[in-house]
Amino acid sequence: MTRAVRVLLVDDDALVRSGLRMMLAGAERIDVVGEADDGRGVLGAVDLHRPDVVLMDIRMPQLDGIAATRLLRSQPDPPAVVVLTTFDTDELVLRALRAGAAGFLLKDTPPAEIVRAIELVHAGDGMLSPAVTRQLIALVAGEGGAPARHDGARELLESISPREREVALAVGRGLPNADIAAELHMSVATVKAHVSRLLVKLGVENRVQIALLVQDATDASR
């Protein structure tokens, strides 16, 4: 039997944490193992509870979710982070993803979609709500003042094998591993192996950052 995904809730609002806990209690493959009420408590809570996935609010009083995500992702063998917030401004989305978040969802996202996001990031996929995905692509495509980053991204994509590039481009379109496997006629295990190699070769932390790099490379080619 597959082990349940261990989840840590991080939000300064006790009512929000309680609501999330109640909602996730109905998901049989998810186990809420702990809570923290501020970004400063994340490292201690992670050490104590050893979660697989952290659901992280952005706006918190002492240490916000973006700084906490960056701090957490700098640790050895960190859990995946899904940012869950009422705010979906362009700047917040991009800052959270560049900090290492594997997903960005709004708090009004349907419960089933939140559960799916947790399961996807635990399996190594990324997760963005459709509205946030559209914003992100538009934002990165329109970012100015970063030609060096765009050129660097293009050079990185040119340095990998053609098959790895196909996988990277599919990740950049937001496809999960199963869809990439079907499209490129390979097994899911092979896709996972390609993604793992891409993380190392491209120097990024997760598949969402692969998608950001792909978009940067696309901008460099325009």
Q: What are these model-predicted stretches?
A:
Residues D57, T85:
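Active-site residues of response regulator receiver
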Residues M60:
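Receiver (REC) domain active-site loop signature in two-component systems and cognate sites
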Residues D38-G41, L63-A67:
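Acidic catalytic/metal-coordinating carboxylates
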Residues R173-Q209:
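Recognition helix of helix-turn-helix DNA-binding domains
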Residues H49-L55:
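Active-site beta3 strand of CheY-like receiver
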Residues V93-R98, D108-P162, E166, D216-D219:
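Short, flexible helix-to-coil linker/hinge segments that flank and couple to helix-turn-helix
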Residues G44, I66-D77:
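Short amphipathic alpha-helix used as the core "switch/output" element in two-component signaling
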